[in-house]
């Protein structure tokens, strides 16, 4: 990506939303804006079927990060810039968090030269082979 990147998260981001938000912040891709994620990253595998067809699950998979270990679970990830969405924002069709992210991206663009990517040479030939290997 050439140019600045910002990401939004909030208290409704859990599971992959927690993981993405934390990885985005940990790798320093750009500023993370919004509210702290809810902290539910333990994975399940619905593989135990009961006689009535219902399926049971139990916590099985945990996520570990180089900077905080297992600490995203039960806490979440704090954004770099906290932006509250007021309770009436949805009713008024107002997205304060999105507006803040766009404003931040535009601020970052002011100090970042952005242009077309450099020529990387000839593109690879991606046509399928005429015959598939046996």
State where each predicted segment sits.
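C-terminal "post-core" interaction segments
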Residues: 1-134
